């Protein structure tokens, strides 16, 4: 938090250290206040204590500006992709439930090979579900279930387009790996059970508390109507 000062309190040489009034007021007000303080700091004859206090204030304001810009970007990106994430979460939940049911049925057979394979599938589905929820809200969402037609439309003979596809696939694999490690180390900020119960979860990204979209974490409808598995395939 930036240092607070009493309203209207003036410093020597007319320097004002009021910053509380701009907190929460948006990026424009923060930028203006930062410029004002930086202009003040350019003055040669500025008392040492005033300079120190203003330097601290401008540092705090820059952090606040970064937070504000981060949250604004996160909201814009989340809004753009919230429907894709919503349907992908529902699909991931459905696939996990199917995998759990399959494991339960296979476990009754005592066939170790089949049980091992079923457990592996459950783990895969858990990673997918956590991926959808944990994917940073400030990034363009990379779908787990991309439409094959979209990939077919990409001109692979175009080096730029081909590189874009490769980078997208690399990011998808890298983030799935991160999620897998979080699950293995029991470091997910929620449990898979909570998600299956429809509970809302909040995720931290880079020190920011970014709440998962309500649509993504909303409880599933009570009707049991099955959606086609190829909705996003």
UniProtKB/Swiss-Prot annotation:
The keyword DNA repair does not apply. Its main location: nucleus. Transmembrane segments: none annotated. InterPro entries: Efg1 (IPR019310), EFG1_rRNA-proc (IPR050786). Residues 53-130, 160-188 form a coiled coil. It comes from the Eukaryota. GO terms for cellular component: nucleolus; preribosome, small subunit precursor. One of its GO terms (biological process) is maturation of SSU-rRNA from tricistronic rRNA transcript (SSU-rRNA, 5.8S rRNA, LSU-rRNA). Pfam families: Efg1. Residues 150-169, 210-233 are annotated as: Disordered. Belongs to the EFG1 family. Involved in rRNA processing. This is rRNA-processing protein EFG1. It comes from Scheffersomyces stipitis (strain ATCC 58785 / CBS 6054 / NBRC 10063 / NRRL Y-11545). The lineage of its organism: Eukaryota, Fungi, Dikarya, Ascomycota, Saccharomycotina. The gene is EFG1.
């Amino acid at each position: 938090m930036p240092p607070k000062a009493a309203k209207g309190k003036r410093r020597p040489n007319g320097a004002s250290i009021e910053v509380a009034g701009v907190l929460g007021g948006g990026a424009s007000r923060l930028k203006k206040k930062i410029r004002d303080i930086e202009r003040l700091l350019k003055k040669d004859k500025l008392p040492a204590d005033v300079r120190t206090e203003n330097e601290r204030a401008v540092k705090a304001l820059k952090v606040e500006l970064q937070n504000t810009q981060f949250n604004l970007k996160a909201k814009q990106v989340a809004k753009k992709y919230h429907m894709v994430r919503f349907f992908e979460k529902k699909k991931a939940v459905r696939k996990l439930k199917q995998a759990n049911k399959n494991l339960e049925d296979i476990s009754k057979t005592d066939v170790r090979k089949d049980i091992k394979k079923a457990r592996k599938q459950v783990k895969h589905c858990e990673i997918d579900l956590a991926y959808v929820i944990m994917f940073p809200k400030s990034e363009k969402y990379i779908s787990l279930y991309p439409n094959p037609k979209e990939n077919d439309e990409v001109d692979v003979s175009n080096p730029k387009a081909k590189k874009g596809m490769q980078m997208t696939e690399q990011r998808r694999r890298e983030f799935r790996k991160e999620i897998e490690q979080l699950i293995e180390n029991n470091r997910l900020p929620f449990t898979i059970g909570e998600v299956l119960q429809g509970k809302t979860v909040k995720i931290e990204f880079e020190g920011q508390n970014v709440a998962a979209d309500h649509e993504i974490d909303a409880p599933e409808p009570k009707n049991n109507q099955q959606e086609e598995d190829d909705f996003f395939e």
